[in-house]
Curated annotation (Swiss-Prot):
GO cellular component, one term: DNA-directed RNA polymerase complex
Protein family: Belongs to the RNA polymerase alpha chain family.
Catalytic activity: RNA(n) + a ribonucleoside 5'-triphosphate = RNA(n+1) + diphosphate
Protein name as catalogued: DNA-directed RNA polymerase subunit alpha
Alpha C-terminal domain (alpha-CTD): annotated span: 252-328
Organism of derivation: Chlorobium phaeobacteroides (strain BS1)
MF terms in GO: DNA binding; DNA-directed RNA polymerase activity; protein dimerization activity
NCBIfam families cross-referenced by the UniProt entry: PRK05182.1-2, PRK05182.2-2, PRK05182.2-5, rpoA
Region Alpha N-terminal domain (alpha-NTD), annotated ranges: 1-231
Length: 328
């Protein structure tokens, strides 16, 4: 039997400060110590684990490295990158995409000039300054946009198959601008040693404060449920079961070594994979769908064809194959 603990019946909302970007949420009453426990967990998950959309890289015409100056543009490349990191998006898709920005001077380039080609995203801070183009000059650049969680450094955005001149940049995917919490004493009956946890959330507008704390709570719950459902077992594997596991492991390893040219694929898909240096099934399943769609000439038709092939092997994209020690 678990000792009955004092818990909140619901989360209260401070309606006076509540809007699309800001929210103050109050959980009470809590047992002593649980204000900090819950506040810390929610704050960490909100800042680091919620998905969002950000720019992952750029390619500027006539520029081949990130420390260049651009003829006819007041800002140099590092300044432009710093400005692009601040662009905030609301996205309607989970896949990566690319759009082209071309501006002739004299002009002030803003985040509003980054326009989705197929409605994949919406720029929220359209007035954000990106660059200044002088009269008679032009700024033309490809902007690569992706989905992710938290903060991702530039080196992790350098994927295979990117064009010459591609410059990866740090991505701030988190839609949360700021989170803080405080803990105060509160009364239940005659006792005054219970706690009230006040959570103050500010988002960039791509997600509401209500949805953000709901998602953070679900992420925490998914992890904690592993402990709640834990049941130790004394089950032991027989020698035959161990042998079966070894055989399954070896069969999977051999399957992942299957050469791409041995698959029944179209010439277009074969060529796309060859250019991306994807030689085996193992190379293919370790890639994510979003990554494949960034490769040159690789579209949804090729992706559907590859999915059908993987289903025949009972495989899928985004698999972790490190334990199979793939070689050659």
């Amino acid at each position: 039997m678990i000792y009955q603990m004092q818990m909140p019946e619901k989360i209260d909302v401070d309606e006076g400060t509540h809007n699309d970007k800001n929210g103050i949420f109050i959980a009470q009453p809590l047992e002593r110590g649980y204000g900090v426990t819950l506040g810390n967990a929610m704050r960490r998950v909100l800042l680091a684990s919620l998905p969002g959309t950000a720019i992952t890289g750029i390619k500027i015409d006539g520029v081949f490295h990130e420390f260049s100056a651009i003829d006819g543009v007041r800002e140099d490349v590092p300044d432009i990158i710093l400005n692009l990191k601040k662009v905030r998006f609301r996205s309607s898709t989970k896949r990566s995409c690319k759009t082209t920005v071309t501006v002739d001077g004299p002009a002030d380039v803003t985040a509003g000039d980054i326009v989705a080609q197929e409605g994949e995203f919406e720029v929220l801070n359209t007035d954000l300054h990106i660059a200044t183009v002088n009269e008679g000059s032009r700024l033309s650049m490809d902007v690569y946009i992706g989905r992710g969680r938290g903060y991702v450094p530039a080196e992790d955005n350098r994927g295979d198959g990117m064009p010459l001149g591609f410059i990866a940049i740090d991505s701030i995917f988190t839609p949360i601008k700021n989170v803080k919490f405080s803990v105060e004493n509160t009364r239940v009956g005659q006792r005054t040693d219970y706690e009230k946890m006040i959570l103050d959330v500010e988002t960039d507008g791509s997600v509401s404060p209500d949805d953000s704390i709901s998602l953070a709570g679900k992420i925490i719950n998914e992890h904690v449920s592993l402990f709640a459902n834990f049941s130790p077992t004394d089950e032991e594997f027989t020698e035959e079961e161990y042998k079966q596991q070894d055989d399954e492991f070896e069969n999977m390893r051999k399957m992942l070594l299957t050469r791409i040219e041995d698959l029944d694929l179209s010439v277009r898909s074969h060529n796309c994979l060859r250019l991306a240096e994807i030689d085996t099934l193992g190379d293919l399943v370790s890639r994510k769908e979003d990554e494949l769609l960034t490769y040159k000439n690789f579209g949804k038709k090729s992706l559907t064809e590859l999915k059908e092939q993987l289903e025949k092997f009972e495989l899928k994209f985004g698999m972790d194959i490190t334990k199979y020690q793939m070689k050659g």
